[in-house]
Curated annotation (Swiss-Prot):
InterPro entries: DegV, DegV_C, DegV_domain_contain. The lineage of its organism: Bacteria, Bacillati, Mycoplasmatota, Mycoplasmoidales, Mycoplasmoidaceae. Hexadecanoate binds at S26. May bind long-chain fatty acids, such as palmitate, and may play a role in lipid transport or fatty acid metabolism. This is DegV domain-containing protein UU190. Residues 1-215 form the DegV domain. It comes from Ureaplasma parvum serovar 3 (strain ATCC 700970). It holds the Pfam family DegV.
């Protein structure tokens, strides 16, 4: 399917840019090296987004702006590298079953954490890293916002984009999260709602949510 799409694109364009899911969460970027061999005579640019979900769309917007000036491949890659460092997120994990089943949390520790109803905070900055735990959802959100701020300094620089990524389907639950987050960030900006990608919930399980912030 990808080969067919590329063939069609190269009939219309001299250069094709592919922005992939973060290589820390998927092998898709590495697999493109095989495809690039088939297009040696074409101008194909493959860039690791180091991001997920709506964060990739934010990067696409930046790339489209730069493409108006006919940038070099190196300028495109540099832009994505710089902007991806501003897009940081993390997951608040309520259900530890998938983490225990996948061996990412030892069974004994997992049983204790479940008994105490602990929420795990998992940051992603290109890959997943366990950062903290707390029994309280509001405190978990506060801690995650601090963790993100330590990386991209959104409190100082301001927020360019922010989103809640979730597979939750209860609208009132999502709206409650949105209201709580709006109060905590203390900035006037629309909070988008987007999907929690499969590469995330494959590790942390279902019925969780993440916060993704792009700093200015």
């Amino acid at each position: 399917m990808l080969w067919k799409n590329l063939d069609e694109l190269f009939l219309k364009y001299d250069r094709v840019v592919i922005l992939t899911l973060s290589s820390g969460l998927s092998s898709y970027f590495e697999s493109l090296s095989i495809i690039k061999e088939d297009y040696k005579d074409k101008h194909l640019v493959c860039i690791d987004s180091r991001s997920v979900s709506i964060g990739i769309l934010w990067l696409v917007d930046e790339i489209n702006l730069l493409l108006k000036n006919n940038p070099s491949d190196e300028e495109l890659i540099s832009l994505v590298k710089q902007r991806s460092q501003k897009i940081i997120g993390g997951v608040i994990v309520n259900n530890l079953d998938q983490l225990i089943a996948g061996g990412r949390v030892k069974k004994t520790k997992g049983i204790i954490a479940k008994a105490l109803r602990l929420k795990l905070i998992v940051r992603w900055n290109g890959q997943l890293d366990f950062m903290d735990k707390t029994p309280n959802l509001s405190t978990a959100i506060d801690k995650l916002l601090d963790i993100i701020d330590n990386q991209n300094h959104w409190r100082t620089n301001g927020i360019k984009n922010i989103a809640i990524l979730t597979d939750l389907e209860n609208e009132s639950q999502i709206n409650s999260l949105k209201t709580s987050l709006q109060e905590k960030i203390r900035q006037t900006i629309e909070i988008k709602i987007s999907y929690l990608p499969g590469c995330i919930y494959a590790h942390v399980g279902l019925n969780n949510f993440a916060i993704l912030i792009e700093a200015k």
